[in-house]
From Swiss-Prot:
Belongs to the NAD-dependent DNA ligase family. LigA subfamily. Residues 594-675 form the BRCT domain. This is DNA ligase. NAD(+) binds at residues 34-38, 83-84, 116, 139, 176, 293, 317. Keywords: DNA damage, DNA repair, DNA replication, Ligase, Magnesium, Manganese, Metal-binding, NAD, Zinc. One of its GO terms (biological process) is DNA replication. It holds the Pfam family BRCT. The active site is at residue 118.
């Protein structure tokens, strides 16, 4: 993988993480589970560690979070509320311990850790002045939080005054606000009784409760607080270990989790981690891992901090959760290219904070591999805590009335024959645009952001238009009028006019976007761009032979035949001509002559994760340099730019003796020629 590919991947990861940080920290409306965020963050961090020259000050790894919502007064934390680095395996935890051992001047034997469950709630800071609760704030972005003092005062297990005759002049207590399962269930039951919206999970309920502008509402929510550390402390001599500080907090009335333990050495820590995994279902509140801290405060100070996390602590996260449920039925869906996908209809089950009732079975081979039948008890896993998967079947529980899953021979939507081409795992409907399901998906693809980018025409509008037989081909979209659109559900005059304006704007596009929008099988964005740059106009592309098509970078025999066959079908030609007749146009494709450089006229393959520029930016740069960015390695390949976790392409390049360079090496060469 090239340095440019790595850079592009880093950029994409940063953009994705920033979006989810905004949803999580600013709106308190997370769109993905923590485990998926952790996976993305871990991937970005690993790439930046391997390529430190690509680290930028605004990377999510270099700060804690996002800015707080308006509506509450902002409070700047005197000491930043840092997050923790994560471990996802014993090996990563042991590597953390090794880093500590390497850094300490005098290594105690054994290393003692204060081990805690990682509560799945909201981090808060609570200030006591002369023993009286005076201020509380959310963590926010770690530097600035929101003033939630009035709401924190309503939480019953937080003392308004410390239980001591000799309180500190100032004391900052940090911890987690969460909602136990029992209270969460009662809250949702009451919401259902009153016809109100329920919360998806206890963390969302806690977040929504803490951020109520009316403290009376918060006071009716079953929130609980557990302390996990001391921040500012003035006018008091604190104990010399983290565990003893927690015990001191308990002694002055601050609640601390009852599962906190001292563990001597790595093996004991890992035993604690596994014991918390076993206890997790019966705790009565959500945890998503363990927090493991060097106990000695002096050692903590010696180890210090990196920009966003302490070196002396780590969160060892649990793997994705698995649950058992029953397969009630299997439905078969039809995709844009006619692919038939079996979808498992499950008895609803709560997995990792989300109710799961559907899961893909991928294809007929997967059904055979699992030996799955309707009525079976199946194991559901949310991969990365996001995508529901059936990972196993409890065949010993198969009921007597279990039914075999019969893959259809006719399309469930249009009745056309279903065929499976030799060498492909996917079976497909042969109905083409005669099939409403394929028509809908093809039209959704046509208007999508990366294709024609018609943002005023969404999936629901496409569904209505096809169902009411108002459109059959992409060109029909441009024949719609205001009156027709206003007759549709949820389409007032303003929405209808917005749709028409978007359609008019989309008429001015690029040849690459237009080719991609046509939905030719296996022609993605990169291939569409290569085709546009190579042939310069649609007539030349339409007239190209399979051999001429294979001269284009990233176009092999299979893809060339797909493109060639597409242009041999009269209905496709008619559809394209109709679009042109509706005013679709683009500027003539002009390729600037690249200056002399080592990549001009060469075929380059990208592999692995590019962190400095990202894959798409790297491909664009290669085209500017006069190179061809291909998708597979062959004897015709001149260079392979290898990023992190490069796989089979790198192996094949080494076998063929193709020159391999890193992303950093590639960029260094490019920069040298730019000078």
């Amino acid at each position: 993988m090239t340095i440019m590919d790595i850079n592009q991947q880093i950029k994409q990861l940063r953009d994705t993480l920033r979006y989810h940080e905004y949803q999580y920290h600013v709106l308190d409306d997370p769109k993905i589970p923590d485990a998926e965020y952790d996976r993305l963050f871990h991937q970005l961090k690993a790439l930046e560690q391997q390529h430190p020259e690509l680290i930028t000050a605004d990377s999510p790894t270099q700060r804690v979070g996002a800015k707080p919502l308006a509506g509450f007064a902002q409070i700047t934390h005197e000491l930043p509320m840092l997050s923790l680095d994560n471990a996802f395996s014993d090996e990563e935890f042991n590597a953390f311990v090794k880093r500590i051992q390497d850094r300490l001047i005098v290594l105690p034997q054994p290393l003692t850790f204060c081990c805690e469950p990682k509560l799945d709630g909201l981090a808060v800071s609570i200030f006591y002045v002369n023993g009286v609760l005076t201020q509380a704030a959310t963590r926010g972005d770690g530097t600035t939080g929101e003033d939630i003092t009035l709401n924190i005062r309503t939480i019953r297990n937080i003392p308004l005054q410390l239980l001591t005759d000799n309180p500190p002049a100032r004391l900052e207590v940090r911890g987690e606000v969460f909602m136990p399962h029992e209270g969460f269930n009662r809250l949702n039951e009451r919401a259902l009784e009153h016809g109100e919206k329920t919360f998806a999970n206890p963390r969302n309920a806690a977040a929504g409760s803490l951020r109520q502008l009316d403290p009376k509402i918060t006071s009716r929510r079953p929130l609980v607080f557990n302390a996990y550390s001391v921040g500012i402390a003035e006018g008091v001599e604190l104990p010399a270990t983290h565990y003893e500080r927690l015990q001191w907090l308990k002694s002055v009335g601050i609640p601390v989790n009852s599962e906190v333990q001292l563990c001597d050495g790595s093996e004991k820590v890992l035993e604690f981690y596994r014991s918390m995994q076993q206890k997790r279902p019966t705790l009565g509140y959500d945890i998503d891992g363990t927090v493991l801290k060097i106990n000695d405060i002096g050692l903590q100070r010696e180890l210090g901090f990196i920009s966003k996390a302490p070196r002396w602590a780590i969160a060892y996260k649990f793997p994705a959760q698995e649950e058992l449920t029953r397969l009630n039925d299997v439905e078969f869906q039809v995709g844009r290219t006619g692919a038939i996908t079996p979808v498992a209809k499950l008895a609803p089950v709560f997995v990792a904070g989300v109710t799961v009732s559907n899961a893909t079975l991928h294809n007929g081979d997967e059904i055979a591999r699992l030996d799955i039948a309707i009525g079976d008890t199946v194991v559901i896993r949310r991969a990365g805590d996001v995508i529901p998967q059936i990972i196993g079947v409890l065949h010993e529980r198969r009921p007597a009335n279990a039914q075999a899953i019969v893959f259809p021979t006719q399309c469930p939507v249009c009745g056309s024959k279903i065929v499976r081409i030799e060498g492909e795992a996917v079976a497909r409907c042969t109905g083409g645009l005669f099939c409403d399901a394929q028509r809908k998906e093809a039209l959704k693809h046509f208007v999508s952001r990366r294709a024609m980018d018609i943002d005023g025409v969404g999936a629901k509008l496409i569904e209505q238009l096809v169902d009411k037989e108002l459109i059959r081909t992409p060109a029909d979209l441009f024949k719609l009028d205001l009156i027709t659109l206003m007759r549709l559900e949820r389409m007032g005059e303003k929405s209808a006019q917005n749709a028409l304006d978007s359609l008019e704007k989309a008429k001015n596009t690029t040849l690459a976007r237009f080719i991609f929008a046509l939905g030719i099988r296996e022609v993605g964005e990169a291939t569409a761009l290569n085709l546009a740059n190579h042939f310069k106009n649609l007539d030349a592309l339409q007239a190209a032979s399979p051999e001429q098509l294979q001269e284009v970078a990233d176009v092999g025999e299979v893809v060339a035949n797909r493109i060639y066959v597409f242009w041999r079908e009269q209905h496709n030609i008619d559809a394209v001509n109709d679009l042109i007749a509706q005013g679709i146009h683009w500027e003539t494709v002009e390729t600037k002559e690249a200056g002399e450089n080592p990549f001009k006229g060469k075929t380059v393959v990208l592999t692995g994760t590019l962190t400095q520029m990202g894959r798409n930016e790297t491909k664009d740069l290669l085209q500017q340099l006069g190179a061809k960015a291909a998708g597979s390695v062959s004897a015709k390949t001149h260079f392979v730019i290898a990023g992190d976790n490069a796989g089979s392409k790198l192996t094949k390049a080494q076998e063929l003796g193709v020159a391999v360079m890193s992303e950093a090496e590639f960029l260094a060469i490019v920069n040298a020629y730019k000078r």
